[in-house]
Amino acid sequence: MTDSYENLLKKAYSHISEKSASSERFVVPEAKAYVEGKTTILENFAEIADTVRRDKDHLMKYMLGELGTSGKIEGNRAIFNGKFEISQIRMIIKSYVDDYVICSECGKPDTRLVKDDRVLLLRCDACGGHRPVRKRKARTEPASENLEEGQVLDVEIQSLSKRGDGVVKMGRYIMYVSNAKPGQSVKIKISRISGSIVFTERAE
């Protein structure tokens, strides 16, 4: 009986280490996207969905909502109507993984989405934890296809760039505001537009 118990114990530990190792190796493939005509193509969309173990339609719906556009899944690719920066695509995928994949208690990706009384929960198979999937605020900013240099706007800083500048996403545009913090409301003047990147200065 002792040998049998020890064997069972070894098997249990091996399963734990296997799951732990798979979690530590969890790396979301970097988005490979490019602009083609008036569309943006995410070339490795299916690979990303498979890695995070989520339904392709669910991931696509989330991305379309965040980009404020329409699109379709075509084979292993996702096609979005409009021209978007690859940095914006990668930021949205990271937000999806944070909200719908990573356990907030143990930080592991061994999770699944389940519904309980119409509430969508993220349940972790690694630690047993669960939490409601937090819904992001509905997009209230305009799609703004007509931003112009010299235009003055009131904006709310949403995040920080690696350089420490405030970041505001507005439709297909990404604005950078110096000396600003997330949650801060500021009045800015557009100094330069390069594609979908908008450089600003404070407007007093």
From Swiss-Prot:
Superkingdom to which the source organism belongs: Archaea
Residue ranges of every copy of the TRAM domain listed in the record: 146-204
Signal peptide extent: none
UniProt GO MF annotations: translation initiation factor activity
PROSITE patterns: TRAM
Keywords recorded for this protein, A-Z: Initiation factor, Protein biosynthesis
Keyword Aminoacyl-tRNA synthetase: no
Coiled coil: none
Entry keyword annotation includes Protein biosynthesis: yes
SUPFAM superfamilies found in the cross-reference section: Nucleic acid-binding proteins, Translation initiation factor 2 beta, aIF2beta, N-terminal domain, Zinc-binding domain of translation initiation factor 2 beta
Subunit structure: Heterotrimer composed of an alpha, a beta and a gamma chain.
Role summary: eIF-2 functions in the early steps of protein synthesis by forming a ternary complex with GTP and initiator tRNA.
Family: Belongs to the eIF-2-beta/eIF-5 family.
Name this polypeptide is given: Translation initiation factor 2 subunit beta
Gene name in the database record: eif2b
